[in-house]
From Swiss-Prot:
This is 2,3-dihydroxyphenylpropionate/2,3-dihydroxicinnamic acid 1,2-dioxygenase. It holds the Pfam family LigB. Gene3D superfamilies: LigB-like. GO terms for biological process: 3-phenylpropionate catabolic process. InterPro entries: DHPP/DHXA_dioxygenase, Xdiol_dOase_suB. It comes from Photorhabdus laumondii subsp. laumondii (strain DSM 15139 / CIP 105565 / TT01) (Photorhabdus luminescens subsp. laumondii).
Amino acid sequence: MTVKLICTSHTPLMGFGSPPEATEKHVRQVFQQLAEQIKDYDPQLIVIFAPDHFNGFFYDLMPAFCVGVRANAVGDWDIGKGPLNVPENTAKDLISALYDSGIDVAHSWRMQVDHGFTQPLMLLCQNLQRYPTIPIFINCAAKPLPTCRRAVELGRAVGQFLFTTDQRVLLLGSGGLSHDPPIPQMGQVPPEVEEGLIAGRNPTKEARQKRQIRVIEVGKSLARGENIVAPLNPQWDDELLRIFCSGDIRRLASLTEGGIAIQGGKGGQEIRCWIAAFAALSVYGEYKAQRHYYQPIKEWLAGMAMVSAQPVTQIGA
């Protein structure tokens, strides 16, 4: 009945953008250090909370939350492709437990996940099959969004289920911190772009490449100081990290979509995934968190952060 948590930003521009060499080296070193910790811990179950970027979930049917019973990575940005190692019976038991807790999640037997899930799994676990993994999608991009309060309730319900299992559990939260990727918004784009947001599954290789080139160019523009998207916000990121590490779940639940958008940009909404993960951890009691890394990396369009935590009762055990 042990648990550990790691929350990390993700950025598809790692490997495509060009920050100072020392910056990228440091990021990869910290990921490797965390990967070694996971290897030593040898989790029997990973539960990952992550968003999607209109690669697997679309406006034709957009859930607030979805648990994958079976899941396949689409391989966007060449970051992991193929099936995840989902323990189906455990995933179904989790879904039933969430229903009993009043959390009406969607569930999928053909979930498509993108780099929001696969980048942390690849960097921390080396592949998508190494550990049994239950993916939990949180809608952080397709307005209207679930509230942060509801993300807390989801996380706590997941934590209550995991607390009853006799397994070494690793909680992963993926997303944020401040960043403002060029994600089209319904009502603000031409009909053909809206159609891609509604039903854009399985795009052609050319269409995916065109979309990725656009994101790369925005990263280059931001690095040149051309704020064609909202700038990164280190002050907001730092305060968020302080709150996460303090254990103030109530404060996290009070964050609003509008406030996050002003301070953290469109991509800042992904902190719901961190919120759910920390809320799940809080079920185990008081926790101690460690801030491993933070740097605003314009070339990657990301306030890049990595944090780990575990219950104080398990430290040194």
